[in-house]
Amino acid sequence: MNDHDGVLTHLDEQGAARMVDVSAKAVTLRRARASGAVLMKPSTLDMICHGTAAKGDVIATARIAGIMAAKRTGELIPLCHPLGIEAVTVTLEPQGADRLSIAATVTTVARTGVEMEALTAVTVTALTVYDMCKAVDRAMTITDIRLDEKSGGRSGHYRRHDADVKPSDGGSTEDGC
């Protein structure tokens, strides 16, 4: 599985925080997919899907925010390595009458993975949806943010047992609205 199972690698022997030294790791293709959702009133989701929000195109703005966030993760998470990102895909799809599902896939060729970048992309996408729609629905709930799948590196492939990962995910930019 992983050389560090059960060990907090961001702490040294004295318990002080440190950035993990990845210089001895191989440079490999790494990919991570995360997901989450925003729960809202059906009228809010309808407004988003029909493009009638007062602040503009919620889907396009949230997608761009998520992509930008993935690229800035190393600045936001203190011990996260700054990485060159090869690709970021963010999708937003309505599910039912009151749920906007978000997925982000991040790809790099590096010595460390992009799980945090994918999780950050989903989180900032959801926050942007909330920001753009809060005037009409302050009760929106950001929920279920999680890592669904990752590949590459020493720890190999991980797929969450209940992940709903589409085989073609990673390249699609079509949204269900």
UniProtKB/Swiss-Prot annotation:
<dbReference type="Pfam" id="PF01967">
    <property type="entry name" value="MoaC"/>
</dbReference>
<feature type="binding site">
    <location>
        <begin position="116"/>
        <end position="117"/>
    </location>
    <ligand>
        <name>substrate</name>
    </ligand>
</feature>
<keyword id="KW-0501">Molybdenum cofactor biosynthesis</keyword>
<dbReference type="InterPro" id="IPR050105">
    <property type="entry name" value="MoCo_biosynth_MoaA/MoaC"/>
</dbReference>
<protein>
    <recommendedName>
        <fullName>Cyclic pyranopterin monophosphate synthase 3</fullName>
        <ecNumber>4.6.1.17</ecNumber>
    </recommendedName>
</protein>
<comment type="subunit">
    <text>Homohexamer; trimer of dimers.</text>
</comment>
<feature type="region of interest" description="Disordered">
    <location>
        <begin position="150"/>
        <end position="177"/>
    </location>
</feature>
<dbReference type="InterPro" id="IPR036522">
    <property type="entry name" value="MoaC_sf"/>
</dbReference>
<dbReference type="InterPro" id="IPR002820">
    <property type="entry name" value="Mopterin_CF_biosynth-C_dom"/>
</dbReference>
<dbReference type="GO" id="GO:0061799">
    <property type="term" value="F:cyclic pyranopterin monophosphate synthase activity"/>
</dbReference>
<feature type="active site">
    <location>
        <position position="131"/>
    </location>
</feature>
<feature type="binding site">
    <location>
        <begin position="79"/>
        <end position="81"/>
    </location>
    <ligand>
        <name>substrate</name>
    </ligand>
</feature>
<dbReference type="InterPro" id="IPR047594">
    <property type="entry name" value="MoaC_bact/euk"/>
</dbReference>
<comment type="pathway">
    <text>Cofactor biosynthesis; molybdopterin biosynthesis.</text>
</comment>
<keyword id="KW-0456">Lyase</keyword>
<dbReference type="InterPro" id="IPR023045">
    <property type="entry name" value="MoaC"/>
</dbReference>
<dbReference type="GO" id="GO:0006777">
    <property type="term" value="P:Mo-molybdopterin cofactor biosynthetic process"/>
</dbReference>
<comment type="similarity">
    <text>Belongs to the MoaC family.</text>
</comment>
<comment type="function">
    <text>Catalyzes the conversion of (8S)-3',8-cyclo-7,8-dihydroguanosine 5'-triphosphate to cyclic pyranopterin monophosphate (cPMP).</text>
</comment>
